[in-house]
Regions:
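Conserved HGGG/HGGXW glycine-rich cap/lid loop of the alpha/beta-hydrolase fold
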Residues: 45-85
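Flexible "cap/lid" loop of the alpha/beta hydrolase fold
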Residues: 124, 128-161, 195
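N-terminal secretory signal peptides and thylakoid transit peptides that target proteins
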Residues: 1-15
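Post-His helix in hydrolase/transferase enzymes
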Residues: 251-263
Length: 267
């Protein structure tokens, strides 16, 4: 049977609800950050907009969203078209325009580019990067990434004409390596292809220079080099946690990522 986005989202929501009783561990950059994440934080922002990156769609945020909604937050997952950077940024801006007040903007992976560009929106009160790109304004991210060892997932990208995707082997091993195989296979089946043109764009803004920022480094990441993640987090002065996770910490450690977003919402 073909897996549709609706079927997939329904299945993940059910799994998220069942797993709410479990707690995932978090390694923070300092003990205070780890303990503070678990405390109740008064919410100043009631809205959260979440953007997905390459090899995924908006449903990748479902388990995190379930936890945020349980905290009373209004959540919207952007369906990033993965066509060009301006079109992807516009998809985020349209969702931000609809928010009714202060909003936390969250991005995973490639969508850190969108957070960096669209995060200057006046409704955005805080930025959260989850194993995400965080370039400076006008910076060539590809050139920056080349100053670090190439992550294994890069070798698994294949193209059908102008559309790129990850092979199943690379997806399971290098993108979703800490997920149960059955769940990773479902995620592979719904990965959204990206256009080559998407990778040529450069941000013109650096929202992290003017907005408070949080960053979750994935220490076992095989899609973005963890040391590159640490560099970007330090450069932006982000409050940083380290999660022993693959690139998909938002799925393997949804409690941890939700705690980080709630903390940003309380800023």
């Amino acid at each position: 049977m073909m897996m549709t986005r609706r079927n997939f989202s329904t299945a993940i929501v059910a799994g998220a609800a069942a797993s709410l009783i479990s707690t995932h561990g978090m390694a923070a950059s300092n003990p205070a950050a780890a303990s503070g994440a678990a405390k109740s934080v008064p919410l100043k922002a009631r809205n959260v907009v979440l953007a997905h990156g390459l090899f995924a769609d908006g449903s990748c945020w479902t388990e995190v969203i379930a936890r945020l909604q349980a905290k009373g937050l209004n959540c919207t997952a952007v369906q990033n078209p993965l066509t060009t950077l301006p079109e992807a940024v516009a998809s985020v801006q349209r969702v931000l325009d609809r928010q009714d007040g202060p909003t936390v903007l969250v991005g995973h992976s490639f969508s850190g580019m969108l957070v960096t560009e669209a995060g200057v929106h006046p409704k955005v009160s805080a930025l959260v990067y989850v194993a995400a790109r965080a370039p400076d304004a006008g910076e060539d991210y590809t050139a920056l990434a080349k100053t670090y060892p190439t992550p294994p997932a890069s070798a698994g990208i294949v193209f059908d004409g102008d559309e790129g995707r990850l092979t199943e082997e690379a997806f399971l091993r290098d993108f979703a390596g800490d997920l149960p195989k059955a769940k990773a296979e479902v995620l592979y089946a719904v990965q959204e292809p990206f256009h080559k043109a998407l990778l040529t764009g450069k941000t013109t803004q650096a929202a992290w220079r003017s907005k408070p920022s949080w960053y979750a480094v994935s220490t076992e990441d095989r899609t973005i080099n963890p040391d590159l993640e640490r560099f970007m987090a330090k450069r932006m002065g982000a409050k940083t946690i380290e999660v022993k996770a693959s690139h998909l910490s938002l799925i393997s450690h949804p409690d941890t990522i939700a705690h980080l977003i709630v903390e940003a919402a309380g800023h």
